A protein has these predicted regions:
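Soluble extracytoplasmic regions of secretory-pathway and membrane proteins
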Residues: 3-560
Length: 560
């Protein structure tokens, strides 16, 4: 009869217990930390390395010898990590890193074709910080004892739905047509409250273009909201864990909430895959999660629902722009030849013709002031447009607005402050726009415009219409003084046109005529009184040699 040595049995039991312990430890680690188990990410190799070290330590302590197999496994993992780490750097792939940005470099004349002129009614007058203050100070009330506002997402939405706010029986009917809004979920304020309450019951909705319209939504189309799958959720209500255990693998980024055309909230998560070793992640699609039911929909970039605005995370686009500007002549560029960089650390989100764009100015590598051009990247498609046109940066524009007579003293005495300048196409002019608020209030007190091409062209006023009128008047004054646009009598012509559109902005009137297509003509009522009156046909005197997209009318006569 053959007996198994006691030492062998003990060794087997020790090995079994050690294996079970390692399995339990890494199961808990994966469940809690939720690393990405994918061979193109570093997380799996970190686990392999940790397992190899534990096995090696076990074999040395229990068996009192260092196994060559275990040592070989450990060395193999370390070598793979070193090699992958090296080839994942721009040192070896500078050109590939630079090519991550899907960019079209265009002449400044194409600016108006892609970044459309924005109606004043669509301009963002409410910053993210202001939106948060409006809800927290005027809407949260006792709700703040059990939940808090989550991250706001900028969205442009076309929708039709009805809401009720917390504690209100009044039903509010929203009909949106490309309406820019801020949306944020109510999140659990602590893990204990997430355990106890299970769900939160609403989301915040703030109009970007109207600071008087902000809502804390509790019911949509008569049904109370039950938000369960949140970033602040615990255990299987944790949003990322919910995605992982339902088979959504790979890298994830930019967790946010957007509402669909029926007013219902959805978590939108960008899915990514590393493109160069462990680096340069690229967007491959979206995971869209019903916050209430937990239903998950995976889509490609082109197949994403229309209500999803933000597919490309800001962090990814910032990296792409940085690589595009830095590695223009490879990784080594001792003289910084042709290198460029963004003017600001963070990107601004601006609206144009139904789409949102990340915006940043672009300047030379060592520049501290003027810009070389403007970069716009579609938040949904990732398509970037770079317009080569010198101008001023956001800080210079904010300083120019802050130096205006109306706000200078308030800024100096810290009773007024400026929100970050946003970039817009105002009647064909690249323009920075900012709201001026009192330090003890969140509502805009003044509105300011500054040309991105000339910081001397500034308009500030208590109303948006007055501010843009002052700005345009200043612009036309500067334009008329420029050498190329001085209207001489020889260049002035008179023509009869049919009015197709007239828009009033303060005391400025903007005309489009059937005979001139998209060309715009301008006049001020304090100079040409007749522009105020309705007319079908007019005789206009203007500078025929002007190359500007906006032409100042020197004469205006109503015919019929």
């Amino acid at each position: 009869m053959t007996f198994i040595p006691v030492r062998t049995i003990r060794s087997f039991k020790s090995s079994l217990l050690a294996s079970l312990g390692i399995f339990v430890c890494f199961t808990l680690f994966n469940c809690l930390a939720m690393p990405v188990i994918s061979f193109d990410t570093i997380a799996i190799y970190v686990e392999y390395l940790a397992i190899a070290i534990l096995i090696l330590l076990y074999s040395g302590i229990v068996n009192e010898e260092w196994s060559k197999v275990n040592i070989g496994f450990l060395i193999s993992v370390v070598v793979v990590m070193l090699v992958m780490g090296c080839i994942s750097t721009p040192m070896f792939h500078a050109g590939d890193f630079r090519d991550q940005l899907n960019i079209e470099v265009q002449d400044s004349t194409a600016f108006d074709e892609n970044i459309h002129q924005i109606p004043l009614t669509k301009m963002n007058r409410v910053s993210e910080e202001t939106a948060r203050d409006l809800i927290e100070k005027h809407k949260m009330g006792e709700l703040s004892q059990k939940c808090e506002l989550g991250k706001f997402t900028a969205q442009v939405i076309t929708a039709d739905f009805k809401i009720n706010e917390f504690g209100s029986d009044e039903e509010i009917h929203f009909i949106f047509k490309e309406q820019p809004i801020w949306v944020a979920p109510l999140e659990h304020s602590s893990s204990w409250k997430a355990f106890r309450n299970g769900v939160t019951n609403g989301y915040a909705l703030v109009f970007q273009n109207d600071p008087s319209k902000y809502f804390l939504v509790n019911k949509v189309n008569g049904k109370e909201l039950q938000l369960q799958y949140l970033e602040s959720g615990v255990l299987f209500s944790d949003l990322e864990r919910h995605l992982r255990i339902n088979g959504v693998d790979g890298l994830m980024d930019d967790f946010g909430i957007e509402i669909n055309e029926h007013g219902l909230p959805f978590n939108t998560v960008s899915l990514l895959k590393n493109n160069i070793g462990w680096s340069a992640p690229k967007v491959t699609g979206m995971a869209i999660v019903d916050v209430q039911s937990g239903e998950i929909t995976r889509t490609g970039i082109e197949d994403a629902p229309a209500f999803v605005n933000r597919i490309y995370p800001e962090r990814i686009i910032k990296n792409h722009i940085s690589w595009w500007g830095e590695y223009v002549h490879g990784w080594i560029n001792l003289t910084d030849k042709d290198r460029k960089k963004a003017t600001e650390e963070d990107l601004e989100v601006v609206y144009s013709n139904g789409d949102n764009y990340y915006y940043t100015g672009i300047k030379s590598w060592n520049s501290k002031g003027s810009t070389l051009g403007m970069m716009f990247t579609n938040t949904r498609t990732g398509q970037a447009f770079y317009y080569e046109r010198t101008g001023i940066n956001e800080n210079d524009a904010e300083h120019a607005i802050a130096s205006h007579d109306l706000v200078r003293d308030g800024i100096r005495l810290n009773t007024l402050s400026l929100n970050d300048a946003l970039f817009y196409n105002i009647e064909g002019i690249p323009t920075y726009f900012s709201t001026v608020i009192a330090t003890n209030d969140v509502m805009p007190k003044y509105y300011g415009f500054c040309s991105a091409l000339n910081k001397q062209i500034v308009g500030v006023a208590p109303s948006l219409e007055e501010a843009v009128a002052e700005y345009m008047k200043k612009y036309l004054e500067v334009q008329s003084k420029s050498q190329s646009d001085i209207p001489s009598e020889a260049n002035l012509v008179e023509q009869t046109f049919t009015v197709s559109e007239k828009v009033q902005e303060g005391n400025m009137y903007i005309f489009r005529f059937k005979e001139t297509g998209t060309q715009q003509f301008y006049a001020f009522s304090d100079i040409l009184n007749d522009v105020r009156w309705k007319a079908a046909k007019v005789r206009v005197k203007y500078n025929a040699e002007s190359s500007q997209k906006m032409i100042l009318m020197s004469g205006f006569e109503i015919i019929e």
